[in-house]
Amino acid sequence: MSVALRQVKANGVELNVALAGEGPAVLLLHGFPHTWQLWTHVLDGLAGRYRVIAPDLRGCGASARTAGGYDAGTLAADAEALLDALGETSAAVVGIDAGTPPAFLLAMRRPDLVRRLVVMESLVGRLPGAEEFLADGAPWWFGFHAEPGLAESVLTGHEDRYIDWFLDAGTLGQGVDPAVRDAFVHAYTGTEALRCSFSYYRALPESSRQIQEAVRTARLTVPTMAIGAHPVGSALEQQLRPVTDHLSGHVMENCGHIIPLHRPDRLLALLEPFLAPAGSTGSRGQLQHHGRRQ
């Protein structure tokens, strides 16, 4: 598989974008602490049928490090502008972790643009449904990352050990390919790189407000798939079900948070029939099953 890297200006920001394949567009939005290489093991499976668009999100990897704009609404605008810059008028959108809230808001705002939505291993703001997951509070690093300047001052010079912890925990101890690991460590090394990544957490109150406002005035009409693993499980599906017209939910057993690197084959088995354009075999049947364990 051939992957082309391009710098694309979108919403006023230079984004580093990996492009592969031809066909209907599939936009992949990574989370923390990732870059476009998060999708390394699923690109082959998707690029045979789709034009895969995998950016480094604003402030991450080789994309521009901006002073602000890390709220879900601005990130959704980045994604919309990226599709427009690449000449796409319709796309399936797949988000994981920090990529989920902007993917959700893009689908809410532009159901004419987003033909399928897949969201994984995240919560969408403070929508009801995640009470059990949050019973003991949010994961410890949320508060650590949210305090301005704190995490950067503690972690600068120790980024590799910190990233390794997330990669190990996110694959249930399996770890990731050394080349991918090294790419992530490089992308998140340095005080400014850390500031940008932690700005996602510092923007969570605004992102939550944007999500609450979106569901107050509209429903999610785009066919949607919610995929959970460890630790989020079915919490995302439970949040989405009251506000979504067409939703399928899946929880992957024995799978860590970083689904595309830990269980790429199982992820592809879910994505391939769901992402199929309207009229293709299996494109609609996926919406009839709820809470399926994988």
Each language-model region and where it sits:
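Actinobacteria-biased recognition of intrinsically disordered, low-complexity terminal regions
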Residues: M1-S2, S280-Q294
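Proline-centered flexible-loop/turn and helix-kink motifs
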Residues: P33, G48, P111-D112, D245, ...
